[in-house]
A protein has these predicted regions:
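Extended alpha-helical scaffold regions
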Residues: 1-266
């Protein structure tokens, strides 16, 4: 019926956002139907390019690559099977880091409890093996954020972090990238509220970088409050020319019902 068609459409629309998962399913289907030559082309392209931040897709990709090369030569080696094992480790670490960040955030804001012993065990494991995993984008981004959330007065974690953020943020799915940016903006705002005005520049430069990536958008539009905050900080930093261009250039990025009021006010 019509509702089932709508469900399928919504599922497909969401699926379209995940190219790595699509590629893995195409490879799997090609191998099941014995069209291995085409499967091999995709496998070579995927395994020779930079790894995705989607650890589940990486895990399945390397499993399929191991299967493909083993069938091809009847000899093969363990390279891709070992890589699938590494991808599984990254999947575990990445998701644990994300969950612990959210648990710490809720603890800080809402005073909700978490299991301290589990947290200590996880941190001990991660720190003992950090040299093996710190180059992965999810670990290099979420671990410093977790350090801050665990100790909100600390600043050491932020040293060199912005460079990592700018380097890797495009590799994350849009909604996840927005969550990451929100953590960093909150950190900057807390420091600004403590009178640390050097963080105005940090907040502003992060906003400037994220704007063309649509990572400050609320669905399709920039909220009137984001628009106002960027303008306010730009003026405080005397970035008058950039701010004036932003006021006019992002007028159409505001929701239609808020557009004129926000524009005229600012």
């Amino acid at each position: 019926d019509l509702y089932k068609l709508l469900e399928k459409y919504l599922a497909w629309k969401q699926f379209e956002k995940h190219q790595d998962r699509k590629d893995v399913l195409v490879i799997e289907n090609l191998m099941e139907t014995a069209i291995t030559e085409n499967a091999g082309k995709i496998i070579r392209r995927k395994t020779q390019s930079e790894e995705s931040t989607d650890a589940v897709s990486n895990f399945k990709l390397y499993q399929l690559a191991d299967q493909y090369y083993f069938q091809l030569s009847r000899k093969g080696d363990n390279t891709h099977l070992i890589k699938s094992q590494e991808a599984l480790d990254i999947y575990y670490l990445s998701n644990q880091l994300k969950i612990w960040c959210e648990l710490m955030n809720r603890s800080n804001i809402l005073a909700l409890q978490y299991d301290n012993m589990k947290f200590d065990r996880f941190i001990q494991f991660l720190e003992n093996n950090l040299k093996d995993y710190s180059h992965y984008p999810t670990v290099s981004i979420y671990y410093p954020i977790l350090q801050w959330l665990k100790d909100p007065n600390s600043d050491g974690w932020y040293e060199g972090f912005r460079e990592k953020l700018f380097l890797h943020i495009k590799e994350f799915p849009e909604n996840e990238a927005k969550d990451i940016v929100a953590y960093i903006q909150n950190y900057c705002v807390k420091r600004i509220n403590q009178g640390r005005n050097e963080f105005l520049k940090e907040w502003f430069e992060i906003a400037q970088f994220m704007l063309p990536l649509n990572l400050l958008n609320d669905n399709k539009y920039i909220s009137e409050w984001t628009y106002k905050n960027i303008i306010t900080v730009g003026v405080r930093l005397h970035a008058f020319e950039w701010t004036e261009n932003f006021i006019h250039g992002y007028y159409n990025k505001l929701a239609p019902e808020q557009r004129d009021n926000a524009y005229q006010y600012n």
